[in-house]
Design a protein with these regions (language model features):
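Helix-coil boundary and interhelical linker segments in multi-pass alpha-helical membrane proteins
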Residues: 1-7, 75-80, 122-132, 256-269
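N-terminal signal-anchor module of multipass membrane proteins
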Residues: 4-56
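Alpha-helical transmembrane segments in multi-pass membrane proteins
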Residues: 9-16, 46-54, 58, 62, ...
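Short, non-helical or kinked segments that cap or interrupt transmembrane helices
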Residues: 22-29, 37, 102-114, 247-251, ...
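Interfacial segments of multi-pass membrane proteins
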Residues: 31-40, 113-127, 254-262
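Membrane-interface alpha-helices at helix entry/exit sites of multi-pass transporters
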Residues: 36-49, 82, 132, 136, ...
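Intrinsically disordered, low-complexity non-transmembrane regions of multi-pass membrane transporters
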Residues: 160-234
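Transmembrane helical segments that form the transport core of multi-pass membrane transport proteins
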Residues: 238-307
Length: 308
């Protein structure tokens, strides 16, 4: 049951969930859009489905994250209240939504950690549990990008060599199309240069000029079809895993509210957070999508799959 004391916390959590969806939902499928595997709308639809599924599954898979991001152990015991929880949600959500409006991919976990830290400092700067901050928050945030970079440095060359060994090659394309051509027959004035005449042009294209495909077969399946299918599945798994990770962090604000009395995780809290995340992604993902998919680097299908 939603009470008046819980309402500010609920609004703060939903605000944060909306912001999270707007900034994060598309990240997992950005390689699909950037490589041309799927259109923006198709990629967004796939991201939304995977996000909803991950949010619902998080009820069983991510209980420890609920405890971590409820402020227990970081904020001095007995000082956490509904007003503080609402402020944490609104502050973190506003930070993420501002970055989204600017088209900047950001981390909800970083924003939420900063909001929790700010609340702890306001309540009692001398009572902050710095060991908890370092071990449960700072350490994972610092190590995860380095781990991802290290893995891709090892994985991409290995997969590239495997592709070549299997006889799967990138194919060039021959672009043939009608194009205007200038003609100046004998006895015609120079003014005729401005009169276009139809003609044919032929050019050999590569990734920058036309779509790259993979030639060959893998386990009896067309290589390009296999790469695209695996790419789509990998992008969905990224969105699913992110939702499993992020939903409990946001729901923790609701579950820590005194109005809930520290009860077990209610299904309605997860459902509301999941719906808000999905709605935020559907309505406000475009700017972050363009940044991730178009402005950072060019990716082909294989590179997108490897990145995921």
């Amino acid at each position: 049951m939603i009470t008046w004391t819980l309402l500010p916390v609920l609004l703060g959590a939903l605000w944060l969930a909306w912001s999270n969806g707007a900034n994060d939902n598309f990240k997992g499928v950005s390689t699909l859009y950037g490589s041309g595997t799927l259109s923006y709308r198709a990629a967004l639809a796939w991201a939304t489905v995977a996000t909803l599924a991950g949010s619902l599954v998080s009820v069983w898979l991510a209980q420890s994250l609920v405890q971590t991001f409820s402020g227990n152990g970081l904020i001095p015991a007995g000082t956490l209240n509904d007003a503080m929880l609402a402020a944490i949600g609104i502050g973190a959500g506003t930070t993420v939504l501002l970055a989204t409006w600017l088209g900047m991919p950001t981390s909800t976990t970083h924003a939420l950690t900063g909001a929790l830290m700010g609340a702890a400092l306001v309540v009692d700067s001398g009572g902050v549990n710095w060991a908890t901050l370092a071990n449960n928050f700072a350490q994972p945030l610092l190590l995860s990008p380095l781990l991802a970079i290290g893995l891709i440095l090892l994985l991409y060359p290995a997969l590239h060599r495997l592709r070549l060994r299997l006889g799967i090659r990138e194919t060039s394309c021959l672009c043939v199309g009608e194009t205007p051509a200038s003609a100046l027959p004998a006895g015609v004035s120079a003014a005729a240069l401005s009169m276009p005449a139809p003609g044919l042009s032929v050019a050999v294209g590569d990734l920058s000029g036309c779509a790259t495909r993979y030639g060959g077969r893998f386990i009896g399946v067309d290589a390009h079809t296999a790469v695209n299918a695996l790419h789509v599945l990998s992008a969905g798994s990224v969105c699913f895993a992110r939702a499993v990770n992020d939903t409990p962090k946001i729901a923790a604000l609701l579950l820590a509210a005194t109005a809930l009395g520290g009860q077990a995780q209610p299904a309605w809290a997860i459902a509301l957070i999941a719906l808000a995340m999905a709605a935020g992604g559907l309505i406000q993902s475009r700017r972050v999508a363009e940044t991730l998919s178009r402005r950072i680097t060019d990716l082909n299908h294989g590179q997108g799959l490897t990145a995921n």
